[in-house]
Curated annotation (Swiss-Prot):
GO cellular component: chloroplast thylakoid membrane; photosystem II
Highest taxon in the source lineage: Eukaryota
Record InterPro entries: D1/D2 (IPR055266), Photo_II_D1/D2_sf (IPR036854), Photo_RC_L/M (IPR000484), Photo_RC_L/M_CS (IPR055265), PSII_PsbD/D2 (IPR005868)
Gene that encodes the chain: psbD
Pfam families: Photo_RC (PF00124)
Topological relation to the membrane, as annotated: Multi-pass membrane protein
Name used for this protein in its record: Photosystem II D2 protein
Residues with N-acetylthreonine modification: T2
Keywords per UniProt: Acetylation, Chlorophyll, Chloroplast, Chromophore, Electron transport, Iron, Magnesium, Membrane, Metal-binding, Oxidoreductase, Phosphoprotein, Photosynthesis, Photosystem II, Plastid, Thylakoid, Transmembrane, Transmembrane helix, Transport
Residues where a plastoquinone binds: H214, F261
UniProt keyword Flavoprotein present: no
Species name: Nephroselmis olivacea
EC number: 1.10.3.9
Other noteworthy facts: 2 of the reaction center chlorophylls (ChlD1 and ChlD2) are entirely coordinated by water.
Class in the EC hierarchy, top level: oxidoreductase
């Protein structure tokens, strides 16, 4: 008698079927990360388009901020809630709006809606890169690199206002609104003199320089695959083998600077390291500002400038500019504080 011994087929459940459907090879990959990314990105972008088109900032900032009121793509914004809302999540069904959509928009509920959905959407996009990299056997450095922009977004739009008195002090979602927030950061925190800002600028501009140098060097050292006179005819874009000479590039930069990258791994790691580290440093600096930490204070120069009218440095001049920014912005931004400044220090009309 023959007895066949085999392993019974495992029963597939709903989770297995869902996993198969989510991770199926299709034109646009969905994946488990898509369950977070796609709805959050949809709601964040949709909320921003709705707010910039229809919703006023009159009740929160005393401003016009929508296309309906005459703004354009550079001046429209979804503005932050009023300072009196503090750190309320401003849920549509919460005690502030009580289910009234119009009132919710007037109070600034769209801003918290966009900020929270936008944060989770960015995190979902990073998880998407992890998931696809894992599926096809890549290292996860793309996702790690994307943590740089995420850290900046979260620190500026969420952590900074959490350290202040309310969401009011976060940037509104608009081009001119972001510019205004940058001026605010300078006036109230002297942000340009902050070492973390300096590292961020060095990282971002250094990365731009590295990209330009790298792209130009690769184009300069392409292997010719034809007799064309220009780059676009001199090689076949679908050729399987390597297309440029690292040895030639190394020799060129060795002659220019005396040093050069010896291998591609170190070169490309450096191109990853510079911008991502710069963004992380900026995010750390903004977290410090959330706690109102000071940066550099050159008190000796301030004291000497106060005593000697002929002594002035770019640092002391910038401090006076910062005082002007504070005097102008505070009274406009926070009318409920009833801040009063002497007439001689305030601007007249639109004159700077």
């Amino acid at each position: 008698m023959t007895i066949a011994i085999g392993t019974p087929e495992e029963k597939r459940g709903l989770f297995d079927d869902m996993d198969d459907w989510l991770r199926r090879d299709r034109f646009v990959f969905v994946g488990w990360s898509g369950l977070l990314l796609l709805p959050c990105a949809y709601f964040a972008v949709g909320g921003w388009l709705t707010g910039t088109t229809f919703v006023t900032s009159w009740y929160t900032h005393g401003l016009a901020s929508s296309y309906l009121e005459g703004c354009n793509v550079l001046t429209a914004a979804v503005s932050t809630p009023a300072n009196s809302m503090a750190h309320s999540l401003l849920l549509l069904w919460g005690p502030e709006a009580q289910g009234d959509f119009t009132r919710w928009c007037q109070l600034g509920g769209l801003w918290t809606f966009i900020a929270l959905h936008g944060s989770f959407g960015l995190i979902g996009f990073m998880l998407r890169q992890f998931e696809i990299a894992r599926a096809i056997g890549l290292r996860p450095y793309n996702a790690i690199a994307f943590s740089g922009p995420i850290s900046v977004f979260v620190s500026v739009f969420l952590i900074y206002p959490l350290g202040q008195s309310g969401w009011f002090f976060a940037p509104s979602f608009g081009v001119a609104a972001i510019f205004r927030f940058i001026l605010f950061f300078q006036g109230f925190h002297n942000w340009t003199l902050n070492p973390f800002h300096m590292m961020g600028v060095a990282g971002v501009l250094g990365a731009a320089l590295l990209c330009a140098i790298h792209g130009a060097t690769v184009e300069n050292t392409l292997f010719e695959d034809g007799d064309g006179a220009n780059t676009f005819r001199a090689f076949n874009p679908t050729q399987a083998e390597e297309t440029y000479s690292m040895v030639t590039a190394n020799r060129f930069w060795s002659q220019i600077f005396g040093i050069a990258f010896s291998n591609k791994r170190w070169l490309h790691f450096f191109m990853l390291f510079v911008p991502v580290t710069g963004l992380w440093m900026s995010a750390i600096g903004v977290v410090g500002l959330a706690l109102n930490l000071r940066a550099y204070d050159f008190v000796s120069q301030e004291l000497r400038a106060a005593e000697d009218p002929e002594f002035e440095t770019f640092y002391t001049k910038n401090l006076l500019l910062n005082e002007g920014i504070r005097a102008w912005m505070a009274a406009q931004d926070q009318p409920h504080e009833k801040l009063v400044f002497p007439e001689e220090v305030l601007p007249r009309g639109n004159a700077l």
